[in-house]
UniProtKB/Swiss-Prot annotation:
A motif (Nudix box) lies at residues 43-64. Belongs to the Nudix hydrolase family. RppH subfamily. The keyword rRNA-binding does not apply. Residues 6-148 form the Nudix hydrolase domain. Its cofactor is a divalent metal cation. Its EC number is 3.6.1.-. It comes from Campylobacter jejuni subsp. jejuni serotype O:2 (strain ATCC 700819 / NCTC 11168). This is RNA pyrophosphohydrolase. Keywords: Hydrolase. GO terms for molecular function: pyrophosphatase activity. It comes from the Bacteria. InterPro entries: Nudix_hydrolase, NUDIX_hydrolase-like_dom_sf, NUDIX_hydrolase_CS, NUDIX_hydrolase_dom, RppH. Accelerates the degradation of transcripts by removing pyrophosphate from the 5'-end of triphosphorylated RNA, leading to a more labile monophosphorylated state that can stimulate subsequent ribonuclease cleavage.
Length: 156
């Protein structure tokens, strides 16, 4: 995981509703600290923490539940640079290098974005097409790449 730029190791989740595979609706949430920015749950991997442990911890912290099952894992780490307007806020990092997982909410799991440190102020379960219409610009290429991969593999 060596990189020339200083990328923050990060895990991201594409969360499918519990009705998957009968209906393919994907969780997307609006960030509370930015204007109309919608994204998937994601967060940093702590030193010494496994990627999967970080996945479950971040889901619990951001959406109030870690009651998910892993459907698939994107085979590569993907990186992106922070846009200039937020790079100072994220110092010393230039961007993030991410591992993506496709997960399904377990039946009976409840989303709660009103967590101890809320990162989101709204969420929806939407179609793949709607995801592409809602996502913010600097992550769009990665979202398209990951979703297309999971589509090509027959998961969504």
């Amino acid at each position: 995981m060596e990189n020339e730029k200083n990328y923050r190791p990060n895990v991201a989740a594409i969360v499918l509703s519990s009705s998957y595979p009968f209906e393919c609706k994907i969780f997307i949430a609006r960030r509370s600290d930015m204007d109309n920015i919608w994204q998937f749950p994601q967060g940093g991997i702590d030193k010494g923490e496994s990627v999967k442990n970080a996945l479950f911890r971040e889901l619990k912290e951001e959406i109030g539940t870690d009651e998910v099952e892993i459907i698939a894992e994107y085979p590569e780490w993907l990186s992106y640079d922070f846009p200039s307007k937020i790079v100072k806020k994220m110092y010393p990092y230039d961007g993030q290098i991410q591992k993506y997982f496709l997960v399904r909410l377990k039946h009976g799991a409840t989303i709660n974005i009103n967590t101890k440190h809320p990162e989101f102020d709204d969420y929806q379960f939407v179609s793949v097409k709607q995801i592409f219409e809602m996502i913010n610009h600097f992550k769009k290429n990665i979202y398209v790449r990951v979703i297309k991969y999971f589509e090509e593999k027959g998961y969504i």
